[in-house]
Swiss-Prot record:
Function of the molecule: Required for respiratory activity and maintenance and expression of the mitochondrial genome.
Pfam families referenced in this protein's UniProt entry, alphabetically: Neugrin
Gene: RRG9
Coiled-coil region: none
Protein name: Required for respiratory growth protein 9, mitochondrial
Similarity remark: Belongs to the RRG9 family.
Alphabetical UniProt keywords: Mitochondrion, Transit peptide
Transit peptide range per the UniProt entry: 1-20
Broad class of the protein's primary localization: mitochondrion
Organism, as annotated: Kluyveromyces lactis (strain ATCC 8585 / CBS 2359 / DSM 70799 / NBRC 1267 / NRRL Y-1140 / WM37)
Cellular component aspect of the GO annotation: mitochondrion; nucleus
């Protein structure tokens, strides 16, 4: 059949012309040729594109740069700020996984959400200055919509209680030095980072001054700083009166 087509049609015709002439169907993707036909035939079969070739082409276009060597997203003023931030972060991390050095606790994350609800005009940069973290950390916290259920909250409280009991046992067994018999356990709400200059609210634990007849030096030679400071202030007052 193919030899008959070769006699009727010129050898310069392409595969598309054969299909258009009705000799070959359009849906065929392969030809079965004899050895003589492979030698004598000048018909070139179009190469079928490989799988994933289009995806690689799209990635190449996305990674294309202009003549100055800068990425195209830098000069594209139509991009929104969040997308520019995403491109900048991807370029900064060099394709690595997001893993910040400083991580906020669960309470500090709730503080970030509380700040955004109470002060909607504050941007991610403003909150980041308060918490001493990068704006990307604040953006990811505000973007997350996950909230623990009641069962998860109970599990969190149970794990924290178990952890505090374990630490208390370490103190009592003498495995941790400096145990004084009382471990102040207080919960505090801090709106701002631990080293932030502007702290909106902080609840400090109350200091246990102990009995009034407490000695300056106890059996373990521990110095009572509060009593020493009070004694020095008393001497200064007496000198002023004299």
């Amino acid at each position: 059949m193919f030899k008959l087509c070769g006699w009727l049609l010129p050898r310069s015709r392409t595969l598309f012309e054969l299909r258009k002439a009705g000799v070959m169907p359009f849906h065929s993707t392969a030809l079965t040729l004899s050895e003589n036909d492979k030698i004598d035939s000048s018909i070139k079969v179009a190469e079928i594109p490989k799988k994933g070739k289009a995806k690689r082409l799209i990635n190449t276009v996305n990674r294309s740069k202009d003549n100055d060597g800068h990425s195209t997203w830098r000069d594209n003023t139509a991009l929104p700020d969040w997308k520019r931030q995403k491109f900048a972060l991807k370029e900064k991390l060099n394709g690595e996984r997001w893993n910040p050095k400083k991580k906020l606790s669960r309470e500090q994350m709730e503080t970030v959400r509380l700040l955004k609800r109470q002060f909607p005009h504050m941007t991610s940069g403003d909150i980041a200055i308060q918490m001493k973290v990068s704006p990307e950390v604040v953006r990811r916290i505000l973007k997350s919509k996950w909230e623990p259920t009641e069962e998860e909250l109970e599990d969190i409280q149970r794990r924290w209680k178990k952890r505090s009991d374990r630490i208390l046992d370490l103190y009592e067994n003498g495995k941790i030095d400096g145990y004084t018999g009382i471990i102040p356990v207080t919960r505090k709400v801090v709106i701002g980072g631990p080293n932030s200059e502007h702290i909106i609210h902080r609840k400090k634990p109350q200091q246990d001054l102990g009995p009034s007849n407490k000695l300056h030096y106890n059996k373990s030679k521990h110095i009572d700083r509060g009593a020493v400071k009070a004694r020095n202030n008393l001497h200064l007052l007496l000198k002023k009166k004299i």
